[in-house]
Amino acid sequence: MEKLVRIEELSINSLDPNKRALIEQAKQARDSSYAPFSEFYVGCSVLHENGHIGMGSNQENASFPSGLCAERVALFESSKNLEHNKVIEIAIYAESNKYEVPKVLVPCAGCLQVISDIQVRQKSPIKVYMWDGGEVVFCASDVSQFLPFHFELNRK
């Protein structure tokens, strides 16, 4: 078995205004990040098919691992009506004064599973944009680029 990963490398300035706004809203969402332990501040924006954009940021807790990642905060908050309003894209932004932010800012395995589950529930892919604040934005057509085998429960 072989799995090929395809991630597009895009210029932030070449994106249409709506895509750029989604990505910049992920940066804005980072403003509410609470990360006193890792000092790794993450924001996520979630675009729905009706144009609504939900946002979330990582929230750490002194009782590890009780915090939540930005992607899950944004997705859980904004995915209440998936059957009528699918998630079509998410954007992730991070910054840190303590650590180097990866250029390809792949969500953690837990977040990948949540994104994958939402894709299965709504029967459509979710495009993932990843931005470190520089000139380049990375884009994956859906979460299967990072999580080729997801956990799924199917009723008998």
Predicted features by range, described:
Residues 47-49, 58-59:
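Acidic/polar N-terminal loop/beta-strand segments that form early-domain functional surfaces
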